Swiss-Prot record:
Residues 60-69 have a biased composition (Basic and acidic residues). Probable ion channel inhibitor. GO terms for cellular component: extracellular region. Belongs to the neurotoxin 14 (magi-1) family. 01 (HNTX-16) subfamily. Its main location: secreted. One of its GO terms (molecular function) is sodium channel inhibitor activity. InterPro entries: Toxin_22. This is U11-theraphotoxin-Hhn1a. Expressed by the venom gland. Residues 1-21 form the signal peptide. The lineage of its organism: Eukaryota, Metazoa, Ecdysozoa, Arthropoda, Chelicerata.
Length: 113
């Protein structure tokens, strides 16, 4: 019975001592991995920052290429009076003289084509 207890105690002590060594090794491995992970995260962060800066530069470049004259001028909607000589009707509309209603106004209106 004593030999069984002694054997059990010996196995227990070896398991605990080897377990402690493994725990220290695991701790050191985890520290190394976190340091490597931090460097990887820094690298990924810098790469993402570069891509965002490139995208921002492209967007700003496109904005600067547009001039005020390239914007579409305001247009007149359907059924709104327009000038015969300078029609500003929206696309799909034409400046025409009214046929039935509004003939007493003697004005042109924007109508669908």
């Amino acid at each position: 019975m004593n030999t069984v207890r002694a054997t059990f105690l010996l196995v227990f002590v070896l398991a605990v001592s080897l377990g402690q060594a493994d725990k220290d090794e695991n701790r050191m491995e985890m520290q190394e991995k976190t340091e490597q992970g931090k460097s990887y995260l820094d690298f990924a962060e810098n790469l993402l920052l570069q891509k965002l800066e490139e995208l921002e530069a492209k967007l700003l470049e496109e904005d600067s290429e547009e001039s005020r004259n390239s914007r579409q001028k305001r247009c007149i909607g359907e059924g709104v009076p327009c000038d015969e000589n300078d029609p500003r009707c929206c696309s799909g509309l034409v400046c025409l003289k009214p046929t039935l209603h509004g003939i007493w106004y003697k004005s042109y209106y924007c109508y669908k084509k």
